[in-house]
Amino acid sequence: MGKDIKKVVLAYSGGLDTSVILKWLVETYQCEVVAFSADIGQGEELEPVRGKAEASGACAVYIDDLREEFVKDYVFPAFRANAIYEGQYLLGTSLARPLISKRQMEIAKLEGADAVSHGATGKGNDQVRFELSYLAIDPAIKIIAPWREWDLNSRTKLMAYAEKHGIPVPTTQAKPYSSDRNLLHISFEGGVLEDPWAPPEEDMFVMSVSPQQAPDQPEEVLIQFEQGNPVAVNGEKLSPANLLAKLNELGGKHGVGRMDIVENRFVGMKSRGVYETPGGTILRIAHMNMETLTMDREVAHLRDSLIPKYAELVYNGFWFSPEMKLLQTTIDATQENVCGEVLLELYKGNCRVLGRRSDKSLYRMDFATFEEDEVYRQKDAEGFIRLNSLRLRIQSMMNK
């Protein structure tokens, strides 16, 4: 494949791995390399990445702010679905990969590149997510996955390669785990976390304080929804990215959104991950409670049956699949009346609902009251119960 490659677009973070990959691509394939970095809320300045990429041999560098697109077109659709993988994981990394891939492919087209490359290892989910997205957009694109080709399979070897080729290397000691951050969450895995019995050290966490160290006074938060999407916090209208950032700030202050789980990777193995998702945790609780007030029972139950499949598709990298499009269209049709406000309380790692209200509410006090009412004839319940018990009574008679 090497002789056929003239130009490659690399998903570039500026870290040791992708800096080595950039130089390795130039040397191994004798090609031009375009470095692409996406700002999806990592919480760090990306402009220095430009100089590092150029120093490592990049012929061009793209640094794109994708935060609003990430939240509006990837996070919010998933939260309209209440998506959660294996009952615990809010899909922070999974949702970012298709956006990065899409923009990477757009740059490849702009640059006339014939290949794309990424820094995902051959053991993880990200290689699948990146490459399924690439191929869904352009089946003819060539893909270079260095971790499946080279023998630089340790940090020591990467450092030696970097020093040999004059690549800027980290001056700080490597952390005993890997992390990945965006506006929705930060994940930690590997290293000391590979032992599922070993608790994470408190100094690892960056988006949230320890619940024990959180304020002793609870804080109320009001979230407004329109058609399933959050649009305001405490009465202030905010853009999607700014709204999620605000909820991250509030949730992190109160120690909300920490999760330590063992999950099933698409490639077949189990892995342990520790996550901080403060804003996402608040948002999911609020959205689900907004739905309880405004969504028809049978629609809600049918939609809920689709959540595991939706989450599995996102987790496994099928964001651009036809079945994903079908599910999203179906789910979005359920959100038309999910409008109103939810009041929550944040306190020492907990997020609980205090109240909810909506002009689209299906909750009627005159029907639900335990006091005397004139709109519900309680005697009607007798026939309802008798008809619904018919098959049970027949079964009982057969067993005698």
Swiss-Prot record:
The keyword Manganese does not apply. The keyword 4Fe-4S does not apply. NCBIfam families: argG (TIGR00032), PRK00509.1 (NF001770). ATP binds at A11, Y12, S13, G14, G15, L16, D17, T18, S19, A38, G119. GO terms for biological process: argininosuccinate metabolic process; L-arginine biosynthetic process; urea cycle. The gene is argG. Homotetramer. L-aspartate binds at T121, N125, D126. PANTHER family: ARGININOSUCCINATE SYNTHASE. GO terms for molecular function: argininosuccinate synthase activity; ATP binding. L-citrulline binds at Y89, S94, N125, R129, S178, S187, E263, Y275. Signal peptide: none annotated. InterPro entries: Arginosuc_syn_C, Arginosuc_syn_N, Arginosuc_synth, Arginosuc_synth_CS, Arginosuc_synth_type_1_subfam, AS_cat/multimer_dom_body, Rossmann-like_a/b/a_fold. It comes from the Bacteria. GO terms for cellular component: cytoplasm. This is Argininosuccinate synthase. It is found in: Cytoplasm. Pathway: Amino-acid biosynthesis; L-arginine biosynthesis; L-arginine from L-ornithine and carbamoyl phosphate: step 2/3. It catalyses: L-citrulline + L-aspartate + ATP = 2-(N(omega)-L-arginino)succinate + AMP + diphosphate + H(+). It is an enzyme of class 6 (ligase).
